[in-house]
Amino acid sequence: MLNRYPLWKYIMLVVVIIVGLLYALPNLYGEDPAVQITGVRGVAASEQTLIQVQKTLQEEKIPAKSVALEEGAILARFDTTDTQLRAREALMSVLGDKYVVALNLAPATPRWLAAIHADPMKLGLDLRGGVHFLMEVDMDTALGKLQEQNIDSLRSDLREKGIPYTTVRKENNYGLSITFRDSKARDEAIAYLTPRHRDLVISSQSGNQLRAVMTDARLSEAREYAVQQNINILRNRVNQLGVAEPVVQRQGADRIVVELPGIQDTARAKEILGATATLEFRLVNTNVDQAAAAAGRVPGDSEVKQTREGQPVVLYKRVILTGDHITDSTSSQDEYNQPQVNISLDSAGGNIMSNFTKDNIGKPMATLFVEYKDSGKKDANGRAVLVKQEEVINIANIQSRLGNSFRITGISNPNEARQLSLLLRAGALIAPIQIVEERTIGPTLGMQNIKQGLEACLAGLVVSILFMIFFYKKFGLIATSALVANLVLIVGIMSLLPGATLSMPGIAGIVLTLAVAVDANVLINERIKEELSNGRTVQQAINEGYAGAFSSIFDANITTLIKVIILYAVGTGAIKGFAITTGIGVATSMFTAIIGTRAIVNLLYGGKRVTKLSI
């Protein structure tokens, strides 16, 4: 019989709509200003921590809607953002640097919806407010470090083999040249070094020289490593900042986008994200006197560095250990109430420190603080020129064999100790980064964007509904119900997807898909009217109308989906957000227009004697 659906299709349609409605509902309940407390490096908060939080809030007379321990994290909800900020300050001072106290917006979803993991959509920066940074990795410094490593490695190999050389000089494109006493030594060096350094192209040059340059594959690998490692380290630093639902992702070859929703202290964010501080541990060369050091007369294996007081210190160039091996660091005070930083190393770092210190007991070891800072100058491309600043913050005699844990002193004040411990805990950047773009969106503007976005959606929906009802009567009402169902399904699916974030371009995508859904219904209704004018019966006209319009609707939507997939693949940020909502909307509009409206039409007219249609 024409225009009848089997029962399972109706059941499927009802189930899909109900599920979509359930997962769309949390978006109506809004969010509470909240403070989220988590342990550093994955340590779970305990019942004792919960009691401490509750006690602190009571003592400071800060009213909380609720304070709960959930999945190893404490979530305290408040009525206003002012109360939220007061609570964060109070809890940070009490809990110290063992916990991350993050500002958050916690969904006010009822328990029965939370039980089925129904959560509201994640809002993008333009809707929620916050700060956006576009950062550029300083590839010149990253590859320069690799060049230095190659120089040290080749020098070490030549000394190990006993091949004499006179000078080592840096060359263009991060290469290097080594000068030997004669051609025999040069040829021997080439034969020895080539199989040991597959990532270098080593060639003979005139004047008893060899030249070594990195292969294109090695340079590409180094660039990729610098960006990826910086992304990982920035994510760690964002966690230390205490930001909920941040975005840290790559953009292009050497740029990184960082978005921090709800952040209010932008100066602090820039300070932590852009900081390039790390530590180097080196042995002090005690064979050079102060006068020679001040005059810069030092051996080739040493160099002069300054203390914070401006005193010269001669350090060996060989770095015993860098901040890369630091797994944890905390700030505290020593027995003299002076600030110190307690450092824990990974197993490899612990072995290096242990093996070195056992052979050098009684010798002085210096802690060198290394940082890149903006010089205030610009290069030819208008980018800030960074300068490397190094200062000796601590010199101590090695009194015993050190292991995985030790402490450093000589730090000016407790704030600096906390800052240094935070940076070391998060990890040192592989290469300096520059903030090339910064945008701040206030919470008020975010709310305004939400309001305008909702108004745009509702206006588009109302105009479409009026148009459909005016032109297609009862079939227009059926199409209207499909439009509403389409919007519910889009919101429900967006809420279900863990990585989906709704932004202003995403709202534009939703408005666009509502237009696409209207277009599909227009095609179907016009085809039915055409079949009726050709003398078909009502049942035949409905059947032929849907069948005839299907190919046009399907082809149009498939081409749109192809474009959306391409946008998602090559786009970033806002473009991806637009692609996601448009793709979801196209799929749901096909479902509601072809299956949803047909189900309603079949229920109303299927298998019945109908002589006239309201269309």
Curated annotation (Swiss-Prot):
This is Protein translocase subunit SecD. The lineage of its organism: Bacteria, Pseudomonadati, Pseudomonadota, Gammaproteobacteria, Enterobacterales. It is a multi-pass membrane protein. It holds the Pfam family SecD_SecF_C. Forms a complex with SecF. Part of the essential Sec protein translocation apparatus which comprises SecA, SecYEG and auxiliary proteins SecDF-YajC and YidC. Belongs to the SecD/SecF family. SecD subfamily. It is found in: Cell inner membrane. Signal peptide: none annotated. GO terms for cellular component: plasma membrane. Its main location: membrane. GO terms for biological process: intracellular protein transmembrane transport; protein targeting; protein transport by the Sec complex. Part of the Sec protein translocase complex. Interacts with the SecYEG preprotein conducting channel. SecDF uses the proton motive force (PMF) to complete protein translocation after the ATP-dependent function of SecA. GO terms for molecular function: protein-transporting ATPase activity. Keywords: Cell inner membrane, Cell membrane, Membrane, Protein transport, Translocation, Transmembrane, Transmembrane helix, Transport. The chain crosses the membrane at residues 10-30, 452-472, 477-497, 504-524, 546-568, 585-605.
